[in-house]
Amino acid sequence: MVSPTRDAIQSYMSITGASESLAIQRLEEHGNNLPEAINAHFRDVERSIYDDSSLDTRSDYNVVEDNNHVRGSETRPVNESRPVPGALPSILSAARAFRPSLLLDPNYRRNILRQLSGSALSGSPSPSSHTGEVTGFPAHSTWGNDHTRPPGLGAVGDGYARHSPSYGSQVHGGTHRDADSPVHSNDAEEEMIRAAIEASKKDFQEGRLNTRYSLDNNPSSVLSPREVINREDEDIARAISMSLEMEEHESVLRDQLAEFMPQSVEHHDPCQSNTNESTRYQPGSSSVQDNREDMNQKQPINSSSQHRHDLQNSEGSYPEEWGGIPSKELQEAIMLEKAIFGGVANESASHNNQLGIHKESQSPNQRVVREEPERKAALPIEPSGENEDAITLLVRMPDSSRHGRRFLKSDKLKYLFDFIDAAGLVKPGTYRVVRPYPRRAFSIQDGALTFEELSLTNKQEALFLELLV
């Protein structure tokens, strides 16, 4: 037979308190199976304790002690001392709670001692010098006859007393205990674990109910990122639909107003005049649709085609007089339409009214014609579209036409005003340039600043003119 290993012998000795020879004997009896040998040892101890306690006919097992005196300790013979039954359930509880898998744990003995101390039902008074009477284990002869003592049992008591500083507290106490007191087992621990699991389940269910209640009362309080994006998309779609409805409504109002206004008129602003043939609009010019303007806004605009824009007109010609209304009042009515609908009536005038209107502002037109070449010559060279510092400025005029040109970020704002004045559509000094979002207005006083200083650094910037009152 293979002899037990040294580790198994040391483990058996440290757990049971037996001697080395007894540990070797027990391990050999159980085929070097350490857990079985230890379990057999504690079963023998438990059987011996129950057999010995059943022979005792006395009813008073308990030890009644106080701080300085133990009753009957002087008159009772040493060999009549009996173990205090209060300590036995603790040992039995430790034996029943033993798990072989814990043998490798260095804190195993400490855990056993904690279980023993936790199973004690009463507090421990100060230790007494009468060890035979107080601790329940006789000082000279613990079990009387040696043949009735199980092998290694005496070493068990000594081992526990030696290894456990709280051993005395497990057998001391002023509470009277019987041999029939209940023995603690793992049932209490299982009940505590089961109660903790049930409490955890209950908390989880309450948390789900609270979350569902909060969602029912305030669904917007906990929205996922996808739901937030969907709501934003719905808001954008709603805003676009409202914008389209307003545009249709304005179109209907324009049609109703067109019934009371001339069918063919040339727009002329009192603050602007132009006699240049390239910017004079004749009847029969083609209509420019809004979608074409939007397409042109996304593309770089050639300066040669920036000055060509068509206005909407109808087949009929504008008569010379409308119920005695002079041309000046008619022009004011056209400007009123612009103020109401945010734009200017895109209609061309008849040849007769063109002559009448341009006669009133012939002198300013001549001055603008003379200044146009000078302003065009003062403009810097237009950079190419591949230049990283180039920006395209698209300006919407009051007549809904768009003019654009490329500049460098280092160019001054004055060049933009020169470019607009060179177009001859508005009178210099009567307007300002506005960026819609974030809204910011630029006047001629800002002409010394560069586009980069004015935060006009995007590849394409959309601006519009705002006439000064």
Swiss-Prot record:
What residue spans carry the Low complexity bias annotation? 119-129
Q: What is this protein called?
A: Plant UBX domain-containing protein 9
InterPro entries (alphabetical): UBA-like_sf (IPR009060), Ubiquitin-like_domsf (IPR029071), UBX_dom (IPR001012), UBX_domain-protein (IPR050730), UIM_dom (IPR003903)
Keyword entries, A-Z: Phosphoprotein, Repeat, Ubl conjugation pathway
- The chain positions of domain UBA-like read 4-43
Note the superkingdom of the native organism.
Eukaryota
Phosphoserine modification sites are: 181, 224
Q: What Pfam family is a match for this entry?
A: UIM
Where does the UIM domain lie?
Answer: 188-207, 231-250
Q: Where is the composition biased (Basic and acidic residues)?
A: 368-377
| Domain UBX, chain residue ranges per copy | 386-464
* SUPFAM superfamilies linked to this entry: UBA-like (SSF46934), Ubiquitin-like (SSF54236)
**Residues covered by region (Disordered):** 119-188, 264-324, 355-383
Ranges of compositional bias, category Polar residues: 271-289
